[in-house]
């Protein structure tokens, strides 16, 4: 019975391992007769060794690679434990013709001698870079990296491979940049991989399976579908798998554990949880038409950006639980399926379950500037949120032929449980004005569904470049839950306490459609027009309860109905395939009607009031040589959020209540951008220059005031003056050692200037009695008529203040990569300058500076050492904030066949802080937020499947010997 059971297990394992392969029991298995195949690979012209060439065998009458290796630095290769039999030996290297030989191996040692590879002239003619053995090939708008030319550890992941490639960068939030430009989409074999979550591929795809990395600069999705240039481009990083992994399966599993160990001081903004863990597993099966990927993660430390937790709210808003300043525990189970079995269609379906436990904390100090005496306030807050989410995504598209179709549905369900605690105190002239405490517990569920659909018909009725396109979007969300709010405010004259429970219910629906038509005039001109209509409806109720039961006074209800319409007409002239110009105009209209009831009073606003915004449309692109110049100008309108228009007072933070404004209007936005890209592919250098200007018409800002008890009130208002801003960004990346490309210098300069308007008081104003608050009476005194005549004239005590903010920054970086070593030295200098019209004596200057270094080294014995060190210092911050700090992290890893052992120490000196600085027209605030602090983490990772074919074969042979 035991032998039968073992035999069954072995047969199942063999089936999982093989794809188009038949497993035959023969004397080579039962007696252990194996061959060792050796060879040396050299260049046929120079007789120099060729390292990193693929050296593998395929059993006769089969298509699956059974044994695989790469040549070493001397061009030598060795395949161990090849069962006796008939095989095809293949040796391949980028830029060379493949070597192919069929042979029956039945010797203990089969020495293939010296194998000379011939240069493939046809392949090299397509590339700008033509050096023999060069790991980089550039053709048209694609940069291709040969993965075998970049040395990484045996069990390295995709992110480790990318870090060794010239121009590649992995950001702190798990995104990829190439030569300073963000990668918009990451695909595997040309297919979507877990939608927009790049970190899943970076942290889970083994580098061993990668054949090539391609960075593709292509036109936007809309341009590809319609043929009409929209001025946008996207950068795609495509991971091409080695042939032996295009069919079959592979995977990896990892586990890490450790603990926090902060210094002796008791710091509430340092993680004190103790035990830390992180585990993940990935399994993938690939065939010519299908890709199936399964992942699982569980962790309470996101040391690899492996999980991004997103929650969809009632309006479809996406919220990350792992925001900056939060410590998260998370679990994820997901599946992603790509298939091209439907003729002419590519399909992607994904499903995810995610759990999150997020903790955050902060400590802030704010100075509010007033003529009759500054107000100082300090606050501390802590929160914890639990969330469970289930989501499913789909993408079905056809990008070839005259008819293009795209359907993208999405569904999600989430349940949240949040706890928030805060306290604050306010002083003036050295005297305590008030203290406050509050705690909030919110429990809720939300359901969200949406679908984006498009249909484009090109060359309509047989006329080239005539296009007719339709898009249709629909979404719906439901949310419900309950909130318990408790608060206590102690003032000089009185104390106020509240204990209320709210039952919340929200419904939101959105429907929009667009039609596009393009008519060619001759071969170079296309006249196009679009019309878009959208309708949205938002209903929400908030029933309040106190110790006596239902409280109508604090209950509220609102119904919002919105309509928007947009019309666009342009003329596009095509100079060449890469140079064109588009001129036109757009007309946008918004209608927002709101019925609301709060404090026992009903209000209707915005009825029949359309807001119209006209903007020019300018899009120009001109390409010549290595240069591309683009100009872009357009505009849009945007309605205020529903919560900002509710006629209610939010007292969840009793020391800082907020009030909605039913008279808010939509704001318009007109922008202009210009960019110049110089991409010298021969030198591998990139120069980018971008200018951006923006004009906000009637932007939403805030009016804030303190009362004599130090309570800070806020209400959103439209500014009468436009907000004008501009920015410039330039980046230059170049190798310093010619074609060797080991040394890379990057210098980035960023600068911005903005002129904005806000409304503030010169001193205190009367407070609001929350027990007798009447919204209509308050707005009549504060706002006046519907146009805001009292507020804008200054009769309610507010003055118009203009603020000019200037933000210059400099980011130099020097990187060195050679074989097993990668190093980087970088610095950053950011300055914020604020100038105020009401009181120039309050003008401010702050500076954030940082210098740092990073190094990674891998030894021939598969040890890998990684460390980074930085020093940060600050100027212009409040007392007690902005202390300089050292940040030092280190990691050691050791690969042993299919396993990797690692130990990582984060924040070795225990000095890391999370500091933010906020400057507005009338206050300055410094905030420290919760950070992980110092911790140690031990890890074990195992790669399984095809990538360890020889080891898997050994295990199977041993099992068969035990069974028989």
Tell where the protein language model's regions lie, with residue ranges:
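A short, solvent-exposed loop/turn motif at the edges and junctions
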Residues: 59-64, 86-102
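Short, acidic Ser/Thr/Gly-rich low-complexity loop/linker segments typical of extracellular
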Residues: 60-76
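Short, ordered, surface-exposed loop/turn motifs in non-cytosolic proteins
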Residues: 37, 45-60, 136-138
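Short Pro-Gly-centered beta-turn/loop motif in secreted/extracellular proteins
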Residues: 51, 78-86, 94
């Amino acid at each position: 019975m035991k032998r039968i059971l073992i035999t069954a297990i072995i047969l199942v394992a063999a089936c999982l391992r093989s794809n188009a392969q038949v497993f035959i029991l023969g004397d080579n298995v039962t007696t252990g007769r194996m061959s060792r195949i050796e060879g040396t690979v050299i260049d046929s012209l120079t007789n120099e060794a060729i390292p990193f060439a693929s050296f593998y065998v395929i059993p006769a009458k089969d298509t699956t690679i059974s044994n695989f290796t790469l040549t070493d630095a001397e061009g030598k290769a060795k395949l161990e434990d090849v069962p006796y039999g008939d095989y095809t030996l293949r040796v391949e290297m980028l830029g060379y013709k493949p070597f192919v030989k069929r042979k029956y191996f039945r010797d203990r040692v089969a020495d293939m001698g010296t194998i000379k590879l011939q240069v493939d002239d046809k392949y090299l003619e397509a590339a700008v870079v033509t050096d023999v053995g060069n790991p980089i090939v550039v053709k048209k708008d694609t940069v291709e990296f040969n993965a075998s030319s970049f040395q990484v550890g045996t069990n390295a992941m995709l992110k480790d491979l990318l870090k060794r490639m010239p121009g590649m960068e992995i950001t702190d939030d798990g995104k990829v940049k190439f030569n300073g430009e963000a990668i918009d989409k990451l695909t595997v074999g040309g297919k979507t991989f877990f939608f927009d979550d790049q970190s899943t591929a970076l942290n889970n795809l083994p580098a061993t399976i990668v054949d090539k990395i391609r960075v593709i600069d292509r036109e936007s999705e809309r341009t590809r579908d319609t043929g009409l240039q929209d001025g946008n481009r996207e950068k795609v990083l495509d991971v091409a798998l080695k042939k032996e992994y295009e069919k079959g399966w592979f995977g990896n599993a990892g586990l890490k554990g450790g603990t926090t160990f902060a210094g002796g001081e008791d710091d509430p903004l340092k993680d004190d949880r103790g035990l830390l863990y992180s585990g993940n597993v990935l399994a993938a099966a690939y065939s010519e038409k299908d890709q199936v990927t399964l992942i699982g993660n569980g962790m309470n430390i996101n040391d690899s950006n492996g999980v991004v937790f997103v929650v969809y709210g009632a309006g479809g808003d996406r919220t990350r639980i792992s925001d900056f300043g939060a410590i998260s525990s998370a679990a994820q189970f997901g599946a992603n399926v790509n298939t091209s079995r439907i003729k002419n269609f590519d399909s992607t379906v994904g499903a995810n379950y995610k759990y999150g436990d997020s903790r955050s904390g902060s400590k802030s100090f704010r100075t509010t500037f007033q003529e009759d005496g500054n107000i100082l306030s300090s606050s501390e807050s802590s929160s914890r949120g639990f969330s469970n989410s289930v989501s499913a995504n789909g993408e079905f598209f056809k990008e070839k032929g005259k008819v293009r179709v795209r359907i993208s549905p999405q569904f999600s369900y989430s349940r949240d449980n949040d706890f928030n605690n805060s306290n604050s105190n306010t002083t003036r002239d050295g005297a305590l004005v008030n203290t406050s405490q509050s705690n909030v517990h919110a429990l809720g569920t939300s359901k969200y569904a949406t679908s984006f659909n498009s249909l484009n018909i090109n060359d309509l009725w047989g006329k080239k470049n005539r296009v007719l396109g339709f898009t249709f979007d629909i979404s719906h969300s439901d949310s419900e839950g309950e909130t318990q709010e408790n608060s206590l405010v102690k003032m000089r004259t009185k104390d106020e306490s509240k204990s209320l429970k709210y039952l919340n219910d929200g419904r939101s629906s959105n429907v929009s459609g667009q039609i596009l038509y393009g008519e060619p005039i001759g071969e170079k001109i296309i006249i196009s027009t679009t019309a878009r209509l959208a309708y949205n409806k938002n209903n929400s109720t908030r029933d309040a309860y106190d110790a006596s039961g239902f409280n109508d006074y604090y209950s509220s209800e609102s119904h919002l109905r919105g309509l928007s319409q947009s019309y666009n007409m342009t003329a596009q002239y095509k100079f060449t395939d890469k140079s064109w110009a588009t001129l036109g105009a757009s007309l946008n209209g918004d209608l927002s009607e709101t019925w609301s009831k709060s404090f026992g009073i009903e209000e209707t606003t915005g009825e029949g009031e359309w807001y119209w915004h006209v903007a020019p449309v300018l899009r120009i692109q001109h390409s010549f040589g290595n240069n591309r110049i683009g100009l872009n100008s357009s505009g849009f309108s945007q309605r205020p959020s529903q919560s900002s228009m509710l006629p209610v007072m939010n007292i969840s933070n009793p020391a800082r209540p907020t009030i909605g404004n039913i008279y808010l209007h939509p704001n318009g936005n007109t922008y202009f951008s210009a960019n110049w890209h110089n991409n010298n592919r021969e030198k591998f250098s990139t120069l980018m220059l971008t200018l951006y200007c923006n004009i906000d018409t009637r932007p939403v800002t805030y009016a804030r005031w303190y009362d004599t008890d130090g309570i800070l009130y806020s209400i959103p208002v439209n500014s009468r003056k436009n907000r004008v801003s501009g920015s410039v960004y330039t980046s230059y990346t170049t190798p310093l050692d010619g074609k060797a490309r080991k040394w890379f210098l990057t210098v980035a300069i960023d600068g911005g200037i903005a002129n904005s308007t806000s409304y503030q008081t010169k001193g205190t104003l009367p407070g609001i009695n929350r027990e007798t608050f009447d919204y209509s009476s308050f707005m009549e005194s504060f706002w006046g008529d519907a146009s805001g005549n009292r507020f804008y004239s200054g009769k309610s005590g507010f003055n118009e203040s203009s603020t000019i903010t200037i933000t210059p920054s400099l980011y130099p970086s020097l990187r060195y990569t050679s074989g097993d070593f990668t190093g980087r030295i970088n610095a950053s200098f950011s300055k914020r300058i604020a100038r105020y019209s009401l009181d120039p004596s309050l003008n401010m200057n702050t500076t954030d500076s940082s210098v740092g270094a990073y190094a990674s080294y891998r030894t021939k014995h598969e040890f890998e050492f990684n460390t980074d060190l930085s020093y940060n210092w600050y100027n212009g911050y409040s007392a007690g904030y902005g202390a300089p700090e050292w940040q030092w992290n280190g990691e050691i890893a050791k690969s042993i066949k299919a396993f990797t052992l690692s130990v990582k120490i984060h924040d070795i000196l225990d000095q890391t802080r999370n500091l933010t600085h906020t400057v507005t027209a009338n206050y300055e605030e410094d905030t420290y937020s919760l950070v992980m602090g110092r911790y140690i983490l031990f890890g074990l990772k195992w790669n399984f499947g095809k990538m360890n074919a020889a080891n898997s074969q050994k295990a199977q042979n041993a099992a068969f010997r035990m069974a028989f």
